[in-house]
């Protein structure tokens, strides 16, 4: 075990030689030094984890904390942003046990198979409505505002029980948060507006409960309004941004692999597996998952000291050839068992089954409705969100 740095610390690699592949440096580190020194923007020297095996170890070991008030992130945060002195109520993904355990238990009781099944027809209806509008307006279309952004937003509104008359406001503010070019002030104002809308929604559900997630949480009697609002805020933003990013980037990836689209058209039952492969291959959480060591831990021969920041590169782990054969190829028929696009361990994505349903329905409906779907610009002209925490296409012009 070594507590000295075998190589000089470097900043998190972000430069992509090819738009659908992670930075090449990550692959070299995974092969040569899967736990390597990482220089954080504030000057702290922590660690970057790039192999599948080491990533699983970190994410399943509670000696590595997910607490948002002590985390170190490997990217520059917007000017004016302040680190949390305390994690806000309900923001459970930024908490450790026992707080995380309590919230997770309550939410697991709401993400039931019955509720997910009940949502499927509505997600199908929402998807078809947006495809109808695309067809009515005719090509070309920008798939991001026409398809990728609204479908997940409306699906989350269904889950939370947002009244129909309020959904446009939720959509508009969520779009502001995700839109490239929004100023820091605009994003902050949109976050505040969403928080206010969810607080109002919680008050409504107290008075008029329905068969939705927020009403179900209220019925437990175990959460106060601040916690309920925080949970709603977290679910809305996390569930919208991740799935919307996958719908835009996933469609872009499929259109760049016409032979795989041909396989899907010949055998539509492959769409479920294609969703898994897209998540593995693209891994949109491009800056990784932050953790903080709570005590000294040995990992892959390196001594991680208490207080050290650890960044787990899910993108590198999901391209590990030691876990996935021919890992850099895109194959909708491959076995994707073990991918970590939804993270791993006790903090893995709670809404992953809903996200899978949304993507399977959306991709299959899109390519069924528009069998000649193609990019309307050169592939290299599609602008990508290289600076965003969730990698995605900011515009996706298509024709059919």
Enumerate the language-model features and the residues they cover:
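Cytochrome P450
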Residues: 1-400
């Amino acid at each position: 075990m070594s507590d000295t740095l075998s190589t000089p610390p470097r900043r998190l690699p972000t430069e992509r030689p090819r738009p659908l592949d992670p930075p090449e440096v990550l692959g070299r580190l995974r092969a040569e030094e899967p736990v390597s020194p990482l220089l954080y923007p504030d000057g702290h020297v922590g660690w970057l984890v790039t192999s599948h095996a080491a990533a699983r170890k970190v994410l399943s070991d509670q000696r590595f904390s997910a607490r948002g008030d002590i985390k170190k992130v490997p990217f520059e945060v917007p000017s004016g942003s302040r680190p949390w002195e305390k994690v806000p109520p309900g923001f459970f993904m930024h908490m450790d046990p026992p707080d995380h355990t309590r919230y997770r238990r309550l939410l697991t009781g709401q993400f039931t198979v019955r509720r997910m099944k009940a949502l499927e027809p509505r997600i199908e209806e929402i998807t078809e409505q947006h495809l109808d509008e695309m067809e009515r307006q005719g090509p070309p279309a920008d798939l991001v505002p026409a398809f990728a952004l609204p479908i997940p937003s409306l699906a989350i509104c269904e889950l939370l029980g947002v009244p129909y008359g309020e959904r446009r406001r939720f959509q508009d503010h969520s779009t502001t948060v995700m839109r490239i070019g929004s100023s820091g002030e605009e994003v902050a104002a949109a976050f505040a507006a969403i928080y206010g809308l969810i607080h109002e929604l919680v008050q409504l559900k107290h008075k008029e409960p329905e068969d939705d997630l927020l009403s179900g949480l209220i019925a437990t009697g175990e959460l106060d309004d601040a916690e309920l609002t925080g949970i709603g805020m977290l679910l809305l933003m996390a569930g919208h941004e991740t799935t919307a990013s996958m719908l835009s980037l996933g469609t872009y990836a499929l259109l760049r692999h016409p032979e795989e689209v041909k396989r899907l058209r010949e055998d539509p039952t492959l769409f479920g597996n294609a969703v898994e492969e897209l998540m593995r291959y693209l891994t949109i959480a491009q800056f990784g998952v932050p953790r903080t060591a709570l005590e000294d831990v040995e990992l892959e021969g390196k001594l991680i000291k208490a207080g050290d920041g650890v960044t787990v590169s899910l993108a590198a782990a999901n391209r590990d050839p030691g876990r996935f054969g021919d890992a850099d190829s895109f194959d909708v028929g491959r076995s994707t068992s073990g991918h970590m696009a939804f993270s791993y361990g006790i903090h893995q994505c709670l809404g992953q089954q809903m996200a899978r349903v949304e993507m399977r329905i959306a991709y299959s409906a899109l390519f069924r409705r528009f069998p000649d779907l193609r990019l309307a610009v050169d592939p290299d002209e599609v602008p990508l969100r290289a600076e965003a925490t969730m990698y995605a296409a900011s515009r996706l012009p298509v024709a059919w």
